[in-house]
A protein has these predicted regions:
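Short glycine-rich anion-binding loops that position phosphate/pyrophosphate groups of nucleotides
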Residues: 40, 100, 124, 168-172
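A short helix-loop-beta submotif of the ANL/AMP-binding
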Residues: 132-138
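Conserved PLP-anchoring active-site segment centered on the Schiff-base-forming lysine
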Residues: 109-131
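N-terminal small-domain helix-loop-helix segment of the aminotransferase-like
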Residues: 4, 8-98, 105
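Glycine/Thr-rich phosphate-binding loops of Rossmann-like dinucleotide-binding domains
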Residues: 43-45, 103, 127-128, 173-174
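Active-site phosphate-binding strand-loop segment of PLP-dependent enzymes
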Residues: 143-178
Length: 178
């Protein structure tokens, strides 16, 4: 039998089980209101769908450069400048296929095996799973309603942390930093 890595011993991501149960119920004709995941509530804009269709039709599909298409990274940089008045160099932007891939890249770049990383509680369950799979120690930081469920300096003074994950907006609370 193949040996199983200790890093793979993560808690199940229960929301996936909930989604599967909902899918089965929908197949049986049940009307389900999905509140289990942060799926977009609207379709992709027509201009985006048209652009993607055009690109697929005119170009061969294949791998992009590893950090993401330079034109897309430049547009993301411009968006940050327009929206937040932030001068962000496109070379500092990495485009991923989803947040989990971005978490893995970020945590791998920032922490070494065995480092202690604080996460606010409640928090997105995947943070804990990803940190554990990277052999990082997760330290729960109990957050409070009066702080909008965000960690504050007083919450982290005695935890001997190598880093802290601050999410804004936070999942599952939806709270945001000012």
């Amino acid at each position: 039998m193949m040996k199983k890595s200790k890093r793979s011993d993560v808690d199940p991501f229960i929301v996936m089980d909930v989604m599967e149960s909902a899918r089965i119920a929908e197949e049986k004709g049940k009307d389900i209101i999905h509140m289990e995941v942060g799926q977009p509530g609207t379709p992709a804009p027509k201009i985006a769908k048209d652009y993607i269709t055009n690109e697929i039709n005119k170009n061969n599909l294949g791998y992009t450069v590893s950090l993401g298409l330079p034109a897309l990274r430049t547009k993301i940089s411009k968006l940050y400048g327009d929206w937040y008045n932030l001068d962000l160099n496109p070379n500092r932007i990495v485009v991923t296929t989803g947040s989990s891939g971005a978490f893995i890249l970020s945590f791998s770049a920032l922490f070494d095996s065995g480092d202690r990383v604080g996460i606010g509680s409640p928090s997105y369950p995947s943070y804990r799973q990803i940190l554990k799979s990277l052999s990082l120690e997760t330290v729960d930081i109990q957050t409070k309603l009066q702080n909008r469920f965000q960690p504050v300096p007083e919450d982290i003074t005695d935890n001997n942390l190598n880093g802290i994950l601050v999410a804004s907006p936070a999942n599952p609370t939806g709270s945001m930093l000012d």
